[in-house]
Each structure stands twice: as C-alpha cells, then as structure tokens.
Amino acid sequence: MGRGYNLLFVLVTFLVLVAAVTAQGNRGSNSGGGRRPHVGFYGNRCRNVESIVRSVVQSHVRSIPANAPGILRMHFHDCFVHGCDGSVLLAGNTSERTAVPNRSLRGFEVIEEAKARLEKACPRTVSCADILTLAARDAVVLTGGQRWEVPLGRLDGRISQASDVNLPGPSDSVAKQKQDFAAKTLNTLDLVTLVGGHTIGTAGCGLVRGRFVNFNGTGQPDPSIDPSFVPLILAQCPQNGGTRVELDEGSVDKFDTSFLRKVTSSRVVLQSDLVLWKDPETRAIIERLLGLRRPSLRFGTEFGKSMVKMSLIEVKTGSDGEIRRVCSAIN
C-alpha cells in the first residue's frame, strides 16, 4: 500500500507541475491576463523591445523616407477598425489590407522584420499590435517630432475583414469627422491634433485632383483653395492621377506645424483638412496649436497625448487575442 501511495503521490505531483507550466505558458502568450496596457509592460521579459523596434524603423526610414508616414498611417488605419490589434497586418484575400483605403499602405515589411528580430530575442512575448504602435511613435521621432511614452500590452486580434473597414474619408465634413472620432472615444482636440500628422506623407492624385479641376461638377477648382496653390498641385498630378502629391507641400519629410499653417492659408490638398479652418471649434484649436490664440497648446505634446489615446482604442487583452508568431497570419 505504501508503494501504491508513493506512485499516486508522484503522479499527482507531476500533473500539478504540468498544469503550472501550461498556465505559465498561457500567461506569456496572452500578455498579462486582461491587464490594461501600461508603460514598461514587458519589463525583464523583453528589456530591449523598444530599442529593437527603433533600430529596424530607423534603418527603413533612412533608406526610404516614405516609410515614416506609411507606418504612421498604417497605425491609424489599424486602430480605427476593431481597435489597435494589428488586424490591418493580416494577409488574405478578404483581409483589411485588401480594402480600397488600405491598398496604398506601406511599411508591412518593417513590422515583419521587427517581429522576426523580437522573436529571436524574446520568443512569443511581444505582440504585432505593440510593434506597430511603437513603430508609429518612432516614425514621428525620426522625422523630427516629439517623443512620448508608449503603453504596451496589447494582444493581436484574430479577425480581419475588408468589409469592416470604414475609415474617415478625404472629403468628409467637420461634423462627420467629429462623429467618427467621437465613436472611437476621441474628442475634437484629438481630431485636429491627429490630422496635424499630415505634416508628413502624401496622398494619391486620384483622391485630390478633382478638387483642383472640377469641384462638385463645376469645371472649376474649389473656390476655397488659394488660387496660387492650384497650378502647383496640377503640376504634380497628371491627368491620369497616377502619382502622389505632398500633403505638406515643401515639408513632406519633417514633422512640424508647417501643415497646420498651410491649413490657415487654404493650401492643403484634402477637403477634409481644409474645412477644419472653417469650423469655429476646430479653427480655435488650430490657432492654439500654432500659438495664435491663448491658452496656447504645444503641438508635439498634444500629438503624443492623442496618439496614446488612439492606441488604447478597443485593445485586446486576456483571452480576446493572441501573440502572433508572424504578423501576417494568426497562429
């Protein structure tokens, strides 16, 4: 009987150890069991996560500067559909990447490279959603913007459908933009500040050329555009609309307040940007961000705050998500 008892004790002990190891593994793959993202989330589990991501982003931005606005735009597109869960990174015939607004996204290879390096340094630890969030911050800093601390601890989503993509549009009214941002728990200050991110990057000529040649079927440019700005845009946009135009003409690779200043003089290419100067509330915010109205606001500081708010939209934690092995496919 003593021998049988000993065997039973050994078996029970073994099963308890297996359960403990399994639970520990699940905690690692589920990024904290439901805790909200916070600064320093990975701690000693992946101490170099930020430096690894920054190194990869820096290399790609130096070789192709357009990767900086590309990554920033990708992060925005990710957060506005199912929250900041890396769903825009998933490949597939009907994934978010195939939706019309996402077909011109760039920088996927940057995120995949950062993920591969992190998998070697800290296997099954850092989510693709967190990598994209860090990369967006680094893209801003590398183009001259102000740094901010990034809360980490998001999980990767498992759902990505092109039919779910419903992003703010380039011709939206101020009221529509306010409505869309409010639906994502972002206020009007966040709206104006994040639109200020158009200080870097480009837009497809096909999206904007109509405003400069046939606004609302009139056969004339939008009368609210500075007339001297029209020939500059048409020179960049051929009739077939097959190229891209700078969102912040003459300062496309520098993150600063130049774009917001151009909004005040009606020298911006997107109608959704131009109308922000016509609405009293958004106009007042622009003036404060430019130091033209008191109390003034620091654009760099406010941009970081709004990016953090956006990065916490509908984050996945606990059993709601996973940590992908590669960013383009669920496990």
From Swiss-Prot:
Gene3D superfamilies found in the cross-reference section: 1.10.520.10, Peroxidase, domain 2
Residue ranges of the TM segments: none
Primary location recorded for the protein, binned into one broad class: secreted
Glycosylation sites: N93, N216
Tissues expressing this chain: Mainly expressed in roots and slightly in leaves.
EC number: 1.11.1.7
Keyword field: Calcium, Disulfide bond, Glycoprotein, Heme, Hydrogen peroxide, Iron, Metal-binding, Oxidoreductase, Peroxidase, Secreted, Signal
Cell compartment(s), UniProt: Secreted
Catalytic residue list: H77 (proton acceptor)
Record text on cofactor binding: Binds 1 heme b (iron(II)-protoporphyrin IX) group per subunit. Binds 2 calcium ions per subunit.
Signal peptide (UniProt feature, chain positions): 1-23
Catalytic activity field: 2 a phenolic donor + H2O2 = 2 a phenolic radical donor + 2 H2O
Disulfide bonds: C46-C122, C79-C84, C128-C327, C205-C237
Annotated binding of heme b, by residue: H198
GO molecular function: heme binding; lactoperoxidase activity; metal ion binding; mRNA binding; peroxidase activity
Site feature location: Transition state stabilizer: R73
InterPro entries from the UniProt entry: Haem_peroxidase, Haem_peroxidase_sf, Peroxidase_pln, Peroxidases_AS, Peroxidases_heam-ligand_BS, Secretory_peroxidase
Protein name: Peroxidase 69
Taxonomic source organism: Arabidopsis thaliana
Phylogenetic lineage: Eukaryota, Viridiplantae, Streptophyta, Embryophyta, Tracheophyta
